[in-house]
Amino acid sequence: MDIIENPDKYSKRFSAWRGDERLSGYPWVENVHAPLAPLKRALPMLNLGLISIAGAYIDGTEPFDLESRDGDSGFHEIPVEVEAADLRYAAKGYDPKAVQQDRNAQIPVDRLLQYEANAVIGKLNEVWWSVSSWTPNARL
């Protein structure tokens, strides 16, 4: 199943979009089918990977590009041992204040580690991935 069901139609609408930050007239992807599948096992039997769109990156590394019209399709791989104080946020489209005060507001690493310790989930992956909060071109 394709993530974007009609990519050519979407690309045409995206090309006509002005690119204003308020997303006025943004050409949202319109799908009939959802590209998700139900779980086939109980959570304690599963390993969990975390992907966040908070735009997080480790202090001292390259932030996401928020100036590109298409957005930034890159990602940062962040070990779960990295402390919240060592994270920065390249944010566009949301105010990062809440996540700066408590990363679990958008990146629930600490809660998921507690779930792992209490056997609610099987195992949390050793790294998690952060992608940009600014990726208006869904075809990237």
Where are these regions (language model features)?
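Metallocofactor- and cofactor-centric catalytic cores in central/energy metabolism, strongly enriched
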Residues: 1-140
